[in-house]
């Protein structure tokens, strides 16, 4: 008769083998005792790259970064108790932003539930509506069918990947002992399961109606964060060219940087939209939005004021319409919609529309005051992955980054827009891509100091803009309150030198944009993890 420890391990071998057969290449393991069978199966699984992360909250955001940059599901493993609960912020972000994660929580067996057993909490359904699916498997039983577990793994991968990528939770109880009593051979290879997805073709009737509404009329294209696809940028530019329409391109759209035609882009809108009533002055009659809703309030306001024809292109089954203005929702890939519209009779609008917006863009560029965003984008190497923190950092990137031929892939956690886990996410991107740069604020850094442990050994440069607390509130109405300093600005007296030293990161303190440039050059040339603090207070 197979002993329980060996049974636990062979069961774990089967399910982890199923995940690897489904194409998963990365696992993030937070050490614990109850999860030992699964951890051992992961560590002994050829083809699975295992990352060890002590803190489960950081581990989950690290996995998020891996999955965000690779576009493939990533395994997370934690022991029982509060350990998996620490995943929740990253799970919410993954759900909101469409990032595939497989969450495997080890658990106590049924007989230890609801009786005061140590390190035992109710784990089934722990993440509520934030998962695409949630399973609690039975305890391993003698004579189990490995094919069942292979298919559970394949099903979980599919649900995490399509039609709307996101987290899937598997809760796995084990009885003691946790270790096999004898050597165990590798399990049988999972049977290949062939899966095909439908090609989301544009609805020609809906497109015909949209084409009639936009042809020969002034309008705008707005591109927010969206998954990158081959030919997508070129298709968007081709549609804008045909319509003589500007593209309001956010940093996360993938349109601001790269060798493609950028002549139709508006990228300094956050400056001039605050000074110009574009809707009343030029009366745009339509907007076509691609991807997530805009980050900045000026662009949000513009989008919300265009009500006659308001279209959203999004292949994922979600509803992105905070302004409640939609007239058309097109479930297809952006490139497919653009190409289908180009096959219809579209009349371009007058050149004066583009010329007026180009003048606004030119004036904003001429008036631009140089700052750390310009220095960073000038110095960052070509073909780099750049993670931008939430709060003030992403808004400054939106306002000041401009556009360039340099190939940059820009990321941010804009699903739920939290400032937690940002360093860990950037470290995950670095682990996946081989190099990353992160731009974050001082409060964001404080929120994820443990993420510096995951930066160890990574080729990552972290720039911390230390403005002494909640600098974003300087730009919000709360600044006029008498309690502003105490309740919102929350001045901090923190420098990050010793934090960097504690985790073995190179460190440089800079006090101006002129100081920042040589510090960046040194860090990029040296490689390895560096933290550069730009002190603005």
Swiss-Prot record:
Q: Which CDD domains match?
A: TPP_PYR_MenD (cd07037), TPP_SHCHC_synthase (cd02009)
Which top EC class applies here? transferase
Question: Which chemical reaction does it catalyze?
Answer: isochorismate + 2-oxoglutarate + H(+) = 5-enolpyruvoyl-6-hydroxy-2-succinyl-cyclohex-3-ene-1-carboxylate + CO2
The record's EC number reads 2.2.1.9
Alphabetically ordered keywords of this record:
Magnesium, Manganese, Menaquinone biosynthesis, Metal-binding, Thiamine pyrophosphate, Transferase
Task: One Pfam family, please name it.
Answer: TPP_enzyme_N
**An MF annotation (GO) of this entry:** manganese ion binding
Residue ranges annotated as coiled coil are none
According to its UniProt entry, the protein's GO biological process terms are: menaquinone biosynthetic process
Q: How is the cofactor bound?
A: Binds 1 thiamine pyrophosphate per subunit.
**Record InterPro entries:** DHS-like_NAD/FAD-binding_dom, MenaQ_synth_MenD, THDP-binding, Thiamin_PyroP_enz_TPP-bd_dom, TPP_enzyme_TPP-bd
Pathway, per record:
Quinol/quinone metabolism; 1,4-dihydroxy-2-naphthoate biosynthesis; 1,4-dihydroxy-2-naphthoate from chorismate: step 2/7; Quinol/quinone metabolism; menaquinone biosynthesis
**Cofactor(s) the protein needs:** Mg(2+); Mn(2+); thiamine diphosphate
Question: What do we know about how this protein assembles, alone or with others?
Answer: Homodimer.
Stored NCBIfam families: menD
The UniProt entry's sequence similarity note says: Belongs to the TPP enzyme family. MenD subfamily.
Q: What the protein does?
A: Catalyzes the thiamine diphosphate-dependent decarboxylation of 2-oxoglutarate and the subsequent addition of the resulting succinic semialdehyde-thiamine pyrophosphate anion to isochorismate to yield 2-succinyl-5-enolpyruvyl-6-hydroxy-3-cyclohexene-1-carboxylate (SEPHCHC).
Q: What is this protein called?
A: 2-succinyl-5-enolpyruvyl-6-hydroxy-3-cyclohexene-1-carboxylate synthase
In which organism is this protein found? Dechloromonas aromatica (strain RCB)
């Amino acid at each position: 008769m197979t002993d329980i420890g060996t049974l636990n391990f062979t069961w774990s071998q089967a399910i982890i083998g199923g995940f690897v057969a489904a194409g998963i290449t990365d696992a993030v393991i937070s050490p614990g005792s109850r999860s030992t069978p699964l951890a051992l199966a992961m560590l002994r699984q050829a083809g699975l790259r295992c990352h060890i992360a002590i803190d489960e909250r950081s581990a989950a955001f690290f996995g998020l970064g891996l999955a965000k940059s690779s576009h493939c599901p990533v395994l997370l493993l934690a022991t029982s108790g509060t350990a998996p609960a620490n995943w929740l912020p990253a799970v919410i972000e993954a759900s909101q932003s469409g990032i595939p994660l497989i969450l495997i929580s080890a658990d106590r067996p049924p007989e230890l539930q609801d009786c005061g057993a140590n390190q035992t909490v109710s784990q089934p359904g722990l993440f509520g509506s934030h998962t695409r699916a949630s399973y609690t498997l039975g305890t391993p039983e003698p004579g189990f069918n490995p094919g069942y577990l292979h298919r559970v793994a394949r099903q979980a991968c599919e649900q995490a990947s399509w039609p709307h990528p996101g987290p899937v939770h598997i809760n796995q109880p084990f009885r003691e002992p946790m270790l096999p009593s004898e050597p165990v051979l590798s399990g049988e290879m999972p049977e290949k399961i062939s899966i095909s997805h439908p090609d989301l073709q544009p609805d020609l009737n809906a497109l015909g109606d949209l084409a009639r509404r936009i042809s020969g009329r002034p309008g705008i294209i707005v591109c927010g964060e969206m998954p990158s696809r081959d030919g997508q940028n070129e298709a968007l530019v081709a549609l804008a060219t045909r319509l003589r329409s500007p593209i309001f391109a956010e940093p996360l759209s993938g349109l601001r940087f790269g060798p493609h035609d950028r002549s139709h882009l508006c990228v300094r809108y956050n400056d001039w939209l605050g000074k110009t009533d574009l809707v009343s002055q030029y009366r745009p009659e339509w907007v076509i939005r691609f991807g997530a809703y805009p980050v900045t309030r000026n662009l949000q306001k513009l989008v919300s004021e265009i009500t006659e024809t308001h279209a959203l292109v999004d292949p994922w089954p979600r509803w992105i319409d905070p302004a409640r203005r939609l007239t058309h929702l097109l479930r297809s890939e952006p490139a497919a919609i653009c190409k289908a519209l180009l096959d219809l009779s579209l009349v371009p609008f007058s050149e004066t529309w583009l010329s007026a917006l180009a003048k606004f863009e030119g004036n904003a560029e001429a008036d631009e005051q140089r700052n750390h965003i310009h220095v960073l984008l000038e110095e960052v190497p070509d073909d780099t992955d750049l993670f931008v923190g939430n709060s003030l950092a992403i808004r400054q990137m939106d306002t000041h980054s401009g556009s360039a031929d340099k190939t940059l892939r820009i990321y941010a956690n804009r699903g739920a827009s939290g400032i937690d886990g940002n360093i860990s996410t950037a470290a995950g991107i670095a682990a996946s891509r081989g190099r990353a740069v992160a731009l974050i604020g001082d409060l964001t850094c404080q929120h994820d100091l443990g993420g510096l442990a995951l930066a160890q050994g990574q080729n990552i440069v972290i720039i911390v803009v230390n403005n002494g607390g909640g600098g974003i509130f300087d730009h919000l109405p709360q600044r006029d309150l008498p309690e502003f300093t105490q309740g919102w600005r929350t001045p901090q007296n923190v420098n990050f030198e010793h934090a960097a030293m504690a985790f073995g990161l190179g460190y440089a303190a800079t006090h101006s944009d002129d100081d920042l440039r040589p510090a960046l050059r040194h860090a990029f040339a040296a490689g390895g993890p560096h933290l550069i603090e730009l002190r603005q207070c």
